[in-house]
A protein has these predicted regions:
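Accessory "access/gating" subregions that flank catalytic or transport cores
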Residues: 92, 96-169
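Hydrophobic core positions in small helical hairpin nucleic-acid-binding modules
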Residues: 174, 178, 187-224
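Mobile "lid/hinge" segments at catalytic clefts and subdomain interfaces of large enzymes
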Residues: 11-98
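A short, hydrophobic, proline-anchored segment that marks a local hinge/packing element in signaling
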Residues: 3-13, 21, 154-155
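Hydrophobic alpha-helical scaffolding
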Residues: 56, 70, 74-84, 88, ...
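Flexible loop/turn segments at secondary-structure boundaries
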Residues: 26-31, 58, 145-149, 160-161, ...
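Stable alpha-helical structural segments in soluble proteins, enriched in small hydrophobic residues
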Residues: 86-90, 94-97, 128, 181, ...
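Short acidic, glycine/serine/threonine-rich loops at helix termini
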Residues: 1-3, 21-22, 29-35, 63, ...
Length: 224
């Protein structure tokens, strides 16, 4: 819950052309323990404030009531206030740069360039993926509680499959993950194995297939 994501729509001549976004790990977002991290939590409500998708800036102005909700739930209100504003500044600067590009080259050229940029990322990943040894690779690792986490990775010329279905059921402790959270880990592994040095984009991860089982530690069921 410490990781707060901010996203901002980017418009050019009234047309939505992109989004800028950032994510930051905040020092404390409430919960039962300082730092909002504890191995004793048995449900997500003990880990801090949960923020749904909610508008914090409207027409360029702060919605202070929303900002106050974040601040008053932190043991470090001044710190989180500054960190959230740093995130706001970052997405604003990103949006400004994209608007400058769209103004210089035109929105249509900008949008085509973004599509080609994503396609370029995919081509680069597939080129490097084809260099990896094809096969099925499996690993089981014992955890502190005695259970085993299992992963099966299948590599072909055009697909990198991560199969996590054979794993323990979700637990009443802070060891579970969402499928999206696991996908981030899979993307990091894939990037480090294929093309670790060049910038990446959404297209870079198109060759990844992630398979998880609902209700397990790697795909927790809603409400737990």
């Amino acid at each position: 819950l410490n990781d707060i994501v901010l996203a901002m729509p980017v418009f050019s001549d009234g047309k939505l052309i992109a989004w800028t976004a950032d994510i930051a790990h905040n020092s404390d977002v409430g919960g039962m323990a300082p730092g909002s991290l504890t191995g004793d939590a048995t449900e997500i409500f003990q880990e801090g404030i949960r923020l749904p998708a909610i508008k914090v800036i409207s027409q360029g102005e702060t919605i202070q009531s929303v900002m106050d909700i974040v601040i008053v739930n932190s043991r470090m209100p001044d710190t989180i206030y500054g960190d959230v504003w740093a995130q706001i500044a970052a997405v604003r600067i990103g949006a400004k740069r994209l608007q400058e590009l769209a103004k210089k080259y035109g929105a249509n050229v900008f949008e085509r360039a973004m599509v080609e940029f994503m396609d370029f990322g995919e081509k680069a990943s597939r080129r490097e993926l084809a260099k990896l040894t094809n096969g099925v690779f499996e690993l089981s690792e014992e955890q502190d509680d005695g259970s085993f986490y299992n992963v099966k990775i299948t590599i072909s010329d055009d697909l990198f499959t991560v199969d996590l279905r054979d794993n323990p059921k979700q637990l009443s402790s802070p060891v579970n993950s969402t499928k999206d959270g696991v996908m981030i880990a899979a993307q990091m592994i894939f990037k480090s194995m294929t093309d670790p040095y060049s910038p990446c984009n959404g297209g870079s991860f198109r060759p990844i297939e992630l398979i998880t089982e609902p209700g397990t530690v790697f795909r927790i069921a809603i409400g737990n």
